[in-house]
Curated annotation (Swiss-Prot):
Pfam families (alphabetical): Rib_5-P_isom_A (PF06026)
Organism: Paraburkholderia phymatum (strain DSM 17167 / CIP 108236 / LMG 21445 / STM815) (Burkholderia phymatum)
A GO cellular component entry from the record: cytosol
Positions contributing to substrate binding: T32, G33, S34, T35, D85, G86, A87, D88, K98, G99, G100, G101, K125
Known function: Catalyzes the reversible conversion of ribose-5-phosphate to ribulose 5-phosphate.
Record protein name field: Ribose-5-phosphate isomerase A
InterPro entries, sorted: NagB/RpiA_transferase-like, Ribose5P_isomerase_typA_subgr, Ribose5P_isomerase_type_A
Gene Ontology molecular functions: ribose-5-phosphate isomerase activity
CDD domains, per the entry: RPI_A
Active site: E107 (proton acceptor)
Length: 231
């Protein structure tokens, strides 16, 4: 199977999981990206079972609404039974790098409210040590250079994310992103807390303090379910 086919496979598996494990009439959290889009597309056939969704980005909101799935503001929701999202990398303990699509802050906010984080990914995203995928850091624009110096001091290579026309990429929150290359992240929880404490950082794309509870992993043999018991 191609990578796109694996994404569709786990997207359908996630929809099946939600249907089987989440009570009817509830609201679910939905992430951002190509794998999350496959989940949205698979969930659309069963949208009548749920009140709707909380979205992690403008793009996801548009995708949900295109299927007629109601989108709720997180401020109006007390809790979410599950948050479903992909990952750029995931280690064997359920810690992830996320933010390749630029929605890391809203993804982290929605995930923090959910009772369960269901990660959906293909097998290529599983790593022994996080860091081969550049680590996104969302920053307030005026802090970009200062944060870049801190990243360099850690041994990373900071690269400001730009659009196709060379302008700084802006998140849905109006901030910029520094993608950090060259890190070998052996202690993701500690690094997450450390970088998040820097003035000017909105959030870092490490999801370790609130990592995945389980992962539906697309492989050439089918979907593998991985549970992270220490979460």
């Amino acid at each position: 199977m191609t990578q796109d086919e694996l994404k569709q496979l786990v997207g359908q598996a996630a929809a099946d999981y939600v249907i089987a494990n989440v009570p009817e009439g509830t609201i679910i959290g939905v992430g951002t990206g190509s794998t999350a889009n496959c989940f949205i597309d698979a969930l659309a056939a069963h949208k009548a079972r749920f009140r709707g969704a909380v979205s992690s980005s403008v793009a996801t909101t548009a995708r949900l609404q295109s299927h007629g799935i109601p989108v709720f503001d997180l401020n109006d929701i007390e809790s979410l039974p599950v948050y479903v999202d992909g990952a750029d990398e995931i280690d064997h303990g359920g810690a992830m790098i996320k933010g390749g699509g630029g929605a890391l802050t809203r993804e982290k906010i929605v995930a923090s409210v959910a009772e369960k984080f269901l990660c959906i990914a293909d097998a290529s995203k599983v790593v022994d040590v996080l860091g081969q995928f550049p680590l996104p850091v969302e920053v307030v624009p005026m802090a970009r250079t200062a944060i870049g110096r801190r990243v360099t001091a850690l041994g990373g290579v900071p690269i400001v994310r730009v659009t196709k026309d060379g302008a700084p990429f802006l998140t849905d929150n109006g901030n910029e992103i520094i993608d950090v290359k060259g890190l070998r992240i052996t202690d993701p929880r500690t690094l997450e807390a450390h970088v998040n404490a820097w003035p000017g950082v909105v959030t870092v794309g490490l999801f370790a303090a609130r990592g995945a509870d389980l992962c539906l992993l697309g492989t050439q043999k089918g979907v593998e379910t991985i549970v992270y018991p220490n979460r």
